[in-house]
């Protein structure tokens, strides 16, 4: 099997419908057959209430569907499919994406010319065609504090001052050239099978957010290269798969950052546990309050 594609969905039925339509068109072009020989597609639905699973079963019988009885999270959902995936390469794909023609072939061919690459990510585009800044540096505790309190926004990209505050989101790079990176956004990642066999699957202790950061960190620690290439493009309806749970998303993000710090940076500094966790959760509730004041989330 050449390629296994995995999509984890939760209440994104119409986005998922468009995602699978674009994916099938791309896979037919890639394989030269409507039978989709040598590729497989998994959809893991995390107990959606919008009939996402029923839509997949009815409209896309070529997909291997798993309909969970409860929301097991992004990492666990991907791992469910990874346990059955047999491809030499695995594509992790968000349901709020649409493949731009030629992207999958470009990503697959990339590994031929970059033998040390374990992961390659495409350029993500907004619906208006503009480029999303989708790559990040690995988070440090101090760097994330700068980000969460808004210092990165106080010093605009390209300015000669405040560069340290912009490092996490790589704001001084336009995402228009090919380069090695720390962590591309998990909306679309092409992964080599040998990497999965070596470092394992996603850490299910991360329910939603930071699981791919942890996974990329482990990959680079094991000596693999992670690449971004603008020669492959994917349309990304940014944030649509998580915007419905803004409060939960913020809390999960801060808990994920704490788990990442504890797992990779804490060492024997046990005395920092309470400080780090309390500080991050306090910042989370400050962000939630700010969103409510701006009317971006409800008070419920």
Model-based region annotation:
Residues 1-37:
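N-proximal low-complexity "stem/linker" segments adjacent to membrane-targeting elements
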Residues 22, 42-53, 70:
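A conserved acidic beta->alpha catalytic loop
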Residues 67-85, 106:
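Glycine-rich, basic loop-to-helix element that forms the pyrophosphate-binding segment
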Residues 90:
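Short aromatic/hydrophobic "clamp" motif used to bind/position activated sugar donors
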Residues 98-134:
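Conserved donor NDP-sugar-binding/catalytic core segment of glycosyltransferases
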Residues 139-181:
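Short, flexible, basic/aromatic active-site loop/helix in glycosyltransferases
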Residues 173-233:
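A short, conserved alpha-helix in the catalytic core of glycosyltransferases
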Residues 217-297:
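Active-site-adjacent helix/loop segment of glycosyltransferases
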């Amino acid at each position: 099997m050449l390629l296994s594609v995995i999509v984890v969905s939760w209440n994104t039925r119409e986005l998922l419908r468009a995602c699978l339509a674009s994916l099938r068109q791309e896979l037919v072009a890639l394989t030269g057959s409507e039978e989709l020989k040598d590729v497989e597609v998994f959809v893991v639905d995390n107990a959606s209430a919008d009939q996402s699973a029923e839509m997949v079963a009815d409209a896309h019988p070529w997909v291997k569907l798993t309909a969970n009885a409860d929301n097991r999270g992004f990492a666990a959902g991907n791992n469910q499919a990874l346990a059955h995936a047999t491809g030499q390469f695995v594509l992790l794909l968000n349901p709020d994406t649409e493949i731009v023609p030629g992207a999958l072939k470009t990503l697959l061919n990339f590994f031929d010319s970059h033998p040390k690459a374990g992961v390659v990510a495409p350029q993500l585009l907004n619906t208006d065609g503009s480029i999303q800044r989708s790559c990040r540096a690995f988070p440090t505790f101090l760097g994330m504090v700068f980000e969460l309190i808004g210092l990165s926004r106080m010093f605009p990209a390209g300015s000669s001052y405040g560069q340290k505050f912009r490092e996490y989101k790589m704001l001084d790079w336009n995402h228009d050239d090919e380069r090695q990176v720390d962590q591309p956004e998990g909306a679309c990642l092409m992964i080599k099978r040998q990497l999965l066999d070596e470092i394992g699957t996603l850490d299910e202790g991360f329910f939603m957010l930071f699981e791919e950061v942890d996974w990329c960190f482990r990959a680079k620690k094991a000596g693999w290269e992670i690449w971004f290439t603008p020669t492959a493009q994917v349309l990304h309806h940014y944030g649509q798969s998580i915007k419905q749970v803004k409060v939960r998303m913020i809390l999960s993000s801060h808990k994920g950052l704490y788990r990442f710090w504890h797992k990779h940076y804490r060492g024997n500094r046990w005395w920092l546990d309470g400080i780090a966790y309390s500080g991050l959760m306090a910042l989370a509730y400050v962000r939630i309050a700010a969103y409510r004041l701006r009317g971006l989330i409800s008070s419920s």
